[in-house]
């Protein structure tokens, strides 16, 4: 099925049973699952559950991405074999996905015999098709570790701007890209040795072949996301531009992965066998369940195939992967859905602030996984926009929507129905206008989910919940219960409320599967599907005793979560001479706990402020930062906008009032010191994610000048100042 057929297929969903294969990107097997990862898995899981509730044959497939140099080196560092490491990490990842209700039909590993066979089969088919080329290339080689070095395992001086400590493929200061062999004064990140240049035969997938370009131009027209289509067209260029480059699909020994057939000492690059791992995991499931694997993945298959990914790996999934499949005799993806990144409280996740939150720490702290599923769903739509986890909003929204609006409906009605009416609903109440309105809304809500417009689905659902609560408030069952003469009205009110609650639970089931399961047990009904909107509660089936379905989010739980993920300042404070220093409780806590000092009180030795305790100092997280970009702020005569590398996954944006002292180009490439745990501040010009430190005289008029702090060479981004 082509991507352009998606709309007609979706329109036919209620009539025909579809065969649908769905994947999420494979987590790399050298680290923990964190909440940034969970955005994708929760997004995919909601979509999969939506389709299952239509009765379609849906398989949700995943695996750990296990091959490559980083896994090999980490295993060596931990004194393990690579296989021992990936087995341990697999168990951790599976535990985390299970905790958050991610309903994989199979979660496997790319280090499997199925993946080896499929990778070899695809490679040999591409070779037979004239799409594999052999070339001698020159690479950096570590003479100490006796291994060729991937681009990211070499650092040195940028050949363009001469910035130090730049990676082997691109400069973070000037943005230039280059070959690793062009790097000046290079060194191995693995051993510190100076790499030597060595030639080696490598194997390339000929993506530049006109056949690939022609195919991709046609295939891209069916992508559902305009942003993805535009990006693909940018990569492809105009017809005749020949912008596509061949792709190096091989790596030299030592390497943890699959050896290329007929090429001893050469291994498939991880990005070749990783997407093939989708099929390998599915084949493992098919072999165990008796499913016809070939019928799903062969060219021309009527089955649908969807990949959910982060926007940072769009290139691999919309260029290499579909071309590999097309020219190896397989079906191509029906569509690829990319999502944006996650920020926390308006800033990128940070270990120092405790917002680099792991899945396991969330569970260990006692937070309900369905709270996060709901919050992410409320923020997600069909675009590639980034989403923000605002922790205050998280608490408020979960408490208001799920507890205050949704769960509250059942708790207000169930007791009366059990006590007064033997737990049996009034059958005539199932035709109440409010119930009819909710029932009619279910198909639209389901359509929003299938279109990946989860925010719309939940807004619609909560609007209906508001109407149900307004109905209960108007009927006042607690007042009706005081007079036996109101028994019929009380029975109707409770019955309408509980049928409305059943329909709301149906609407929320893709997002809150465990709550839905508890609701099904409460009503004594079979697992809810979309068709069950037309199957109301019946007096023939009494409800069970009501069990509380969800608690409120407590601010203390969030504080504990941040503390669990924050780099401890205890050791640093003690090393500085303070005994019994307390661990900081986050930027907000630090701000709240800080004791004000008098600006008028002169301190000893002419210092500007009164003394502070070592505990107070321990709350401030000072870090080395590299200024990778700098520009003047339009509309401000004081501010410069700095882009800082603080040793985290992403750079930080900081506005600093030092424009009078520096030209932007003077600062690029310099190291400085920043306050890393200062709460992000929304400014007229954007969000500032910290503060850089600068010195000035007490009397700036008599002695003007601003001087940013510069550490000695040898300091690196992310190092703590202590």
Curated annotation (Swiss-Prot):
Record note on cofactor: Binds 1 zinc ion per subunit.
Superkingdom assignment: Bacteria
Motif ('KMSKS' region): 348-352
Main subcellular location: cytoplasm
Catalytic reaction(s) noted: tRNA(Met) + L-methionine + ATP = L-methionyl-tRNA(Met) + AMP + diphosphate
Any one GO cellular component localisation term in the record: cytosol
UniProt-recorded Gene Ontology molecular function terms: ATP binding; metal ion binding; methionine-tRNA ligase activity; tRNA binding
Binding site for Zn(2+): 158, 161, 171, 174
Compartments it resides in: Cytoplasm
Signal peptide: none
Family matches, as PROSITE patterns: AA_TRNA_LIGASE_I, TRBD
Gene Ontology BP term (one): methionyl-tRNA aminoacylation
Chain location of the short sequence motif 'HIGH' region per the record: 27-37
Enzyme Commission number: 6.1.1.10
Entry cofactors: Zn(2+)
Positions annotated to bind ATP: 351
Protein function: Is required not only for elongation of protein synthesis but also for the initiation of all mRNA translation through initiator tRNA(fMet) aminoacylation.
NCBIfam families membership: metG (TIGR00398), metG_C_term (TIGR00399), PRK00133.1 (NF001100)
Family: Belongs to the class-I aminoacyl-tRNA synthetase family. MetG type 1 subfamily.
Subunit note: Homodimer.
Descriptive protein name: Methionine--tRNA ligase
Source organism of this protein record: Burkholderia multivorans (strain ATCC 17616 / 249)
């Amino acid at each position: 099925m082509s991507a352009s057929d998606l709309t007609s297929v979706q329109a036919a969903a209620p009539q025909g049973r579809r065969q649908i294969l769905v994947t999420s990107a494979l987590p790399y097997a050298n680290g923990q699952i964190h909440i940034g990862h969970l955005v994708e898995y929760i997004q995919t899981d909601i979509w999969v559950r939506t389709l299952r509730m239509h009765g379609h044959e849906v398989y949700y497939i995943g695996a750990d991405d296990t091959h490559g140099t980083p896994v090999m080196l980490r295993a060596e560092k931990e004194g393990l074999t690579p296989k021992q490491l990936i087995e341990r990490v697999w168990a951790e990842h599976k535990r985390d996905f299970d905790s958050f209700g991610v309903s994989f039909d199979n979660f496997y590993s790319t280090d499997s015999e199925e993946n080896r066979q499929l990778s070899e089969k695809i490679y040999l088919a591409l070779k037979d098709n004239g799409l594999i080329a052999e070339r001698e290339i020159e690479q950096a080689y570590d003479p100490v570790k006796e291994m060729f070095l991937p681009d990211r395992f070499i650092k040195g001086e940028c050949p363009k701007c001469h910035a130090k400590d730049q990676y082997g493929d691109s400069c973070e200061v000037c943005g230039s890209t280059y070959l690793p062999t062009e790097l000046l004064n290079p060194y191995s990140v693995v051993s510190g040795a100076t790499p030597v240049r060595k030639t080696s035969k490598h194997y390339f997938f000929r993506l530049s072949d006109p056949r690939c370009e022609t195919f991709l131009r046609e295939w891209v027209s069916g992508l559902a996301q305009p942003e993805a289509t535009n990006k693909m067209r940018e990569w492809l260029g105009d017809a005749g531009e020949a912008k596509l480059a061949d792709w190096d699909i091989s790596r030299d020994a030592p390497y943890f992965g699959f050896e290329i057939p007929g090429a001893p000492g050469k291994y498939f690059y991880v990005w070749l066998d990783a997407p093939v791992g989708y099929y390998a995991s599915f084949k493992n499931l098919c072999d165990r369940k008796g499913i016809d694997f070939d019928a799903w993945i062969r060219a021309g298959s009527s089955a649908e195939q969807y990949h959910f990914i982060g926007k940072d790996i769009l290139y691999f999934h919309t260029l290499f992967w579909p071309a590999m499949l097309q020219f190896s005799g397989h079906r191509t993806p029906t569509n690829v859905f990319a999502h944006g990144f996650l920020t926390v409280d308006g800033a990128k996740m940070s270990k120092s602030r405790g917002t680099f939150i792991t899945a396991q720490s969330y569970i260990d702290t006692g937070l309900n996984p369905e709270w996060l599923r709901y919050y992410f769903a409320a923020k997600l739509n069909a675009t590639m926009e980034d989403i923000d986890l605002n922790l205050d909003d998280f608490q408020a929204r979960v408490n208001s929507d799920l507890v205050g609006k949704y769960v509250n409906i059942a708790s207000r009605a169930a007791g009366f129905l059990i006590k007064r009416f033997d737990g049996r609903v009034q059958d005539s109440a199932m035709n109440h206008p409010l119930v009819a309105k909710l029932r009619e809304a279910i198909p639209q809500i389901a359509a929003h989910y299938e279109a990946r417009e989860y925010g719309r689905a939940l807004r619609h659902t909560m609007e209906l919940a508001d109407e149900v609560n307004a109905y209960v408030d108007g009927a006042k069952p607690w007042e009706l219960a005081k007079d036996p003469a109101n028994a019929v009205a009380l029975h109707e009110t409770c019955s309408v409320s509980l049928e409305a609650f059943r329909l709301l639970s149906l609407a929320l089931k893709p997002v809150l599967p465990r709550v839905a399961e508890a609701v099904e047990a409460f009503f004594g009904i079979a697992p809810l599907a979309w068709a069950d909107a037309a199957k109301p509660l019946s007096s023939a089936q009494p409800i069970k005793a009501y069990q509380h379905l969800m608690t409120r989010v407590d601010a203390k739980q969030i504080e504990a979560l941040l503390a669990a993920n924050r780099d401890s300042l205890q050791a640093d404070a003690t090393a500085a001479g303070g005994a019994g220093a307390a661990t900081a409780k986050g930027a907000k806590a630090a701000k709240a706990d800080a004791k004000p000092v008098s600006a008028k009180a002169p301190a000893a030795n002419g210092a500007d402020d009164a003394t502070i305790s070592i505990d107070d100092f321990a709350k401030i997280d000072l870090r080395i930062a590299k200024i990778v970009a700098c520009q003047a702020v339009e509309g401000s005569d004081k501010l410069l906008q700095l882009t800082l590398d603080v040793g985290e996954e992403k750079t930080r944006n900081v506005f600093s009032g030092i424009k009078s002292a520096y030209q932007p180009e003077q600062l690029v490439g310099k190291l400085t010191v920043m306050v890393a745990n200062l709460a992000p501040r929304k400014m007229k010009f954007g969000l500032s994610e910290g503060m850089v430190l600068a010195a000035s005289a007490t009397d700036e008029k008599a002695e003007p000048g601003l001087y940013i702090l510069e550490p000695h060479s040898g300091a690196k981004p992310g190092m703590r100042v202590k």
